[in-house]
Structures are given as structure tokens and as C-alpha cells.
């Protein structure tokens, strides 16, 4: 699974106009920064609730921006959350932090 799907990014550019992509991408990058900061600072049940929240939101935003690997992880965590399989001791928080950092860094490299 790729971190960035160039074809989806190109499709987004056609749909919304190439001038709008950098603006929306900046917003998406800002959201990822917020997610990383909050996941890093929260603890226990608050951290788990926040992971559920952002995983649900990331299913669509990551898909829209071609962040395939992040989208796949978000869908997996959201599914676990809905079935009650997500637990505080699980590895999902660290996996999400790693994937958010990888995705953010890949987009920043791509835009330079």
C-alpha cells in the first residue's frame, strides 16, 4: 500500500481545480499536526476516544487526498472501535502516530 496515491491526487486536482489543492492540502496537513499533537499528549481512555474520533474522520479525508495507507489504517481502527475490539493496551495508537507522521512527511516532501 502506497503512502500517497498520485492518481487520486490528480483526480482531486481535476475535481476541485489545481489552484485549490494546495489550500486544502494545507488544511489536511494542519489536521494531521493536530492529530499527532493530541494523540501524543492524551492518555488512557481520552486517548482511545480521540483515536476513535480521528479514525472515523480520516476514513474520508485520507481517501480524498490519496493517503491510501492512512485511510486503510483508519478504516481498520474504526471497524475495531465499532465492534468493541479497540483497547487501551493495543498498538493502534502508536501505529496511527507512525502513519500520520509518514503521511505528513510524504506530503511535505511532495509539495516542495
UniProtKB/Swiss-Prot annotation:
Keywords (A to Z) from UniProt: Phosphoprotein, Two-component regulatory system
PROSITE patterns reported in the protein's UniProt record: HPT
Subunit structure: Monomer.
Phosphohistidine: residues carrying this PTM: 56
GO biological process: phosphorelay signal transduction system
Domain spans labelled HPt: 17-112
Native source species: Vibrio parahaemolyticus serotype O3:K6 (strain RIMD 2210633)
Protein name stated in the entry: Phosphorelay protein LuxU
Gene Ontology molecular function terms on file: protein kinase activity
NCBIfam families the record matches: Phrelay_LuxU_Vib
Listed Pfam families: Hpt
Protein task: Phosphorelay protein which receives a sensory signal from a sensor kinase and transmit it to LuxO. At low cell density, a phosphoryl group is transferred from the sensor kinase, probably on His-56 and this phosphoryl group is further transferred to LuxO.
Amino acid at each position: 500500500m502506497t503512502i500517497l496515491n498520485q492518481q487520486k491526487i490528480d483526480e482531486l486536482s481535476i475535481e476541485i481545480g489545481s489552484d485549490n489543492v494546495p489550500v486544502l492540502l494545507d488544511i489536511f496537513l494542519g489536521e494531521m499536526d493536530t492529530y499527532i499533537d493530541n494523540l501524543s499528549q492524551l492518555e488512557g481512555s481520552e486517548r482511545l476516544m480521540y483515536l476513535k474520533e480521528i479514525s472515523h474522520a480520516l476514513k474520508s479525508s485520507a481517501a480524498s487526498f490519496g493517503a491510501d495507507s492512512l485511510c486503510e489504517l483508519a478504516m481498520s481502527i474504526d471497524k475495531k472501535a465499532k465492534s468493541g475490539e479497540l483497547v487501551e493496551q493495543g498498538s493502534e495508537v502508536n501505529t496511527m502516530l507512525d502513519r500520520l507522521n509518514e503521511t505528513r512527511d510524504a506530503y511535505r516532501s511532495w509539495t516542495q
